[in-house]
Regions:
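Sec-dependent signal peptide recognition
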Residues: 2-9
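Hydrophobic h-region of N-terminal signal peptides that target proteins for export
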Residues: 9-18
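C-terminal outer-membrane beta-barrel translocator/porin domains of Gram-negative envelope proteins
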Residues: 397, 409-423, 448, 537-538, ...
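Solvent-exposed coil/turn segments that connect beta secondary-structure elements
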Residues: 79, 88, 169-172, 182-184, ...
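Patatin-like phospholipase
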Residues: 19-64, 72-385, 389-390, 405-406
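Acidic/histidine-enriched alpha-helical segments
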Residues: 238-240, 247, 309-325, 525, ...
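Gram-negative/organellar outer-membrane beta-barrel architecture
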Residues: 367, 372, 386-551, 558, ...
């Protein structure tokens, strides 16, 4: 590994044995060993390109981590240009971050991520347990499955167009393991499984992680394969400056780097030719520098031309060599005659087989299959889903391996909420959502929410599908809540009320797809508004029972739960109150919220949101139903400064991505600007239109979005605020 990088970047540097019987060669055979190094490993493509241009044959190839990936792709018969095209088309940022895309989540998992936007979860399946890695490996696994699919039925990696090996670290025996057979995609995943970052690969009761820990430059493996002349490609990163200040994490990272560097020196000592690629100006996460890295590898090979050119073949010999390699390449994938799912319970496997039955007798389209399997992970049950071909009873079938989360259910989604719109009275709460699966029936869910701090809340819902193959469901639920209702005039807090309620209800609904849902329900219980501090005459102190029927429609086509860049969302609620404390009579109520986001350039987008609510002219509702004031509700105004029974609020804004955090810390950082204008009806100041402009930074952290900004509005309203938690 490389000096001068943090422990996280070091981990990326890890990214990258039996004697085989070689084919008969009238010449000295050549073996290539490729070192691990995260994005630095892309330089191997340049080395391969130079060697092919100069007719240097590669009879054997072995690699570790990223070297294993590049070597494995090349071993399937792709030429360096094809390898370059493949790796250049990978969304490395998405692969590294590892989260299932928001658009691919089921509707209920979209609700989870929207309401609990922290970027991590844990489980209680065997006590408190976290995932085996920051990244489940699903996205990278699909890439490897696609590469390896034509070679699924090979018995040995010796039968690939170029014989291949890759190195992994096996944890149960604490030793190096060399993959030479089995599913190629599993082997590539294992050699790249950075400890703590990617979830380990479990095969046949063994646990595999990145091979760079024990053998980052496997020249010994190439020798055992039968190579006469061994070429090692060493990725020379930046060295540690003795004057560089080190944190405890840096010391740990550099210590691991020293251990791995020892394996690299051992590998170089066993090579006949060493190609050392100068990559000091790059880092193990420099995936956006594909062309520069490839060029560096090419230049390093050129610098070693005097050692390499003696292995050059004549044009005739080279064409014969390519023809032999091409003859071992499998050009097409057999059409599967059945679909088989494993890794989960028989009942769940049966559902997945029915869901994927369309592939029975149909040619595999890897992109469409990848999309379907990603949507399966979006159900929340599986950490990763992969595929390969299997043979049974003389027929070729599509095997789907669904890896259930080892730590869940129940799944725990934590939340941390900070509202600093009044820096003298910061509101703070912590909580979590607990989701239990298959309670009483397959696919049934028990969802429990708890929150404590400035607000105390407990809620429970039992989601019961009426059929495994339709969207109809029933959902009994109950909630108890004790929340602050602080009332302001500009920056001055006039009063603090508590809104306490306890309700139970039943919904009947239909989930159309992963984007929208319709519910009909009835809810009844108790509601109280009680003043704690300040002016007790601002709103009525009421207490009593409430009951209402409701219709709710939700649509979510956004591309992100935290800071969307594209898509639309709509939430519409219609309630009819039979009773409510302080209300003179029964009355209807409706409120809606609409969002639209449109990207303009890769780092820029605009958005428009609209909200509105009405009681259709009924004023005797007890406490007014809606409030305006506070972040994203007229940000320059004090919290709940305006009470009303009818309003509208329009917002238009601009988002510009300023930078991007390392995956372990969060995601994007945006500069956000917006203009808000609204109208509240039925109050003395209703003739004017309250408005403001807001500017701030939105930072996507592991604990959810942090928003820091200020707003200036009409009539002298202005405010500085910060908050952590849901924004849009």
């Amino acid at each position: 590994m490389r000096r001068g990088i943090s422990v996280i970047l070091l981990c990326f540097a890890l990214f990258a044995g039996a004697q085989t019987t070689p084919a008969s060669h009238p010449r000295e055979t050549v073996g290539l060993a490729l070192e691990g190094g995260g994005a630095l490993g892309l330089a191997h493509i340049g080395v391969l390109q130079w060697m092919e241009e100069h007719h240097i044959p590669i009879d054997y190839v072995a690699g570790t981590s990223m070297g294993g990936l590049v070597g494995g792709i090349y071993a399937t018969g792709m030429n360096p240009g094809e390898v370059r095209e493949l790796v250049g088309g990978i969304d490395w940022d998405g692969v590294i971050r590892g989260q299932t895309d928001f658009r691919d989540l089921s509707f209920r998992r979209k609700e989870d991520r929207t309401e609990y936007p922290a970027a991590f979860e844990f489980g209680l399946r065997h006590g408190v347990a976290f995932p085996g890695g920051f990244n489940s490996g699903h996205q990278v696994g699909l890439i490897l499955d696609r590469i390896a699919l034509p070679y699924s039925l090979l018995k040995s990696f010796d039968d690939l167009p170029t014989p291949f090996r890759c190195v992994s670290t096996e944890l149960t025996e604490r030793e190096e393991f060399v993959f030479q057979q089995g599913p190629l995609s599993d082997a590539l995943r294992a050699t790249m499984s950075i400890p703590g970052f990617f979830t380990p690969v479990k095969l046949n009761h063994k646990i595999y992680v990145d091979g760079g820990l024990l053998d980052n430059l496997p020249t010994d493996v190439v020798k055992e394969m039968g190579a006469d002349h061994i070429i090692a490609v060493h990725l020379q990163g930046a060295k540690l400056n003795a004057e560089t200040p080190l944190s405890s994490f840096s010391v740990l990272g550099e210590s691991i780097a020293a251990v791995v560097a020892t394996t690299e020196r051992r590998g170089m000592a066993k090579a006949d030719t060493v190609i050392s690629v100068d990559l000091a100006r790059f880092g193990p996460t420099s995936f956006d520098a594909v062309d520069e890295l490839i060029a560096a590898g090419y230049a390093a090979a050129e610098a070693n031309a005097s050692a390499l050119l003696p292995k050059r073949l004549s044009d005739t010999e080279w064409n014969e060599f390519l023809a032999r390699r091409q003859s071992r390449r499998i050009p097409s994938v057999p059409t599967p005659q059945f679909v088989q799912v494993d890794g989960t319970s028989p009942a769940v496997a049966s559902q997945l087989e029915r869901r994927l039955k369309s592939w029975d007798g149909k040619r595999i389209d890897p992109r469409r299959l990848d999309q379907q399997l990603t949507e399966v992970t979006g159900l929340g049950r599986f950490s990763a889903v992969g595929y390969n071909l299997v043979e049974k009873d003389g027929k070729v079938g599509l095997r789907i391996h669904a890896a259930e989360k080892e730590y869940a259910p129940p799944t725990v989604n934590p939340t941390l909420i900070i509202n600093g719109s009044d820096y003298q009275n910061v509101l703070f709460a912590v909580g979590a959502r607990f989701t239990f699966l298959d309670i009483g029936k397959i696919n049934a869910e028990l969802r429990t929410d708890v929150l404590a701090g400035s607000e105390y809340r407990a809620a429970i819902e039992y989601y019961l599908p009426l059929s495994a193959y339709s969207g109809w469901f029933v959902a009994p639920r109950a909630v108890a809540d004790n929340a602050p209702l602080n009332i302001y005039l500009r920056d001055k807090r006039l009063a603090e009320y508590r809104q306490r309620e306890a309700n139970t209800g039943l919904d009947f609904g239909y989930t159309f797809n992963r984007f929208n849902e319709l519910r009909f329900g009835y809810e009844f219980g108790w509601l109280q508004y009680d003043p704690d501090l300040g002016d007790k005459s601002l709103i009525r102190a009421v207490s009593g029972k409430q009951s209402f029927s409701r219709v709710r429609y939700s649509l979510n086509h956004l591309d992100d739960a935290i800071v969307p860049r594209a898509g639309v969302a709509l939430n519409a609620n219609i309630n009819f109150y039979d009773s409510r404390p302080g209300a003179a009579d029964q009355f209807p109520e409706m409120d809606t919220h609409f969002q639209f986001f449109q990207p303009l350039r890769p780092n820029d987008s605009v958005f428009f949101t609209g909200s509105g609510g009405t009681t259709f002219g009924y004023s005797g509702t007890g406490v007014p139903m809606f409030t305006l004031g506070g972040p994203f509700r007229l940000s320059a105004y004090g919290n709940n400064e305006i009470f009303t029974n009818q309003y509208f609020l329009l917002q238009a804004g601009y988002l510009h991505q300023v930078t991007q955090l390392p995956p372990i810390l969060g995601n994007h950082v945006y500069l956000a600007g917006s203009y808000e204008i609204g109208k509240a009806y039925g109050i003395a100041r209703s003739q004017r239109l309250p408005m403001d402009g807001t500017l701030g930074l939105v930072i996507q952290t592991l604990f959810g979005p942090a928003y820091i900004g200020g707003s200036y509005g009409d009539s002298g309203h202005h405010k500085f605020f910060f908050q952590l938690g849901k924004i849009f």
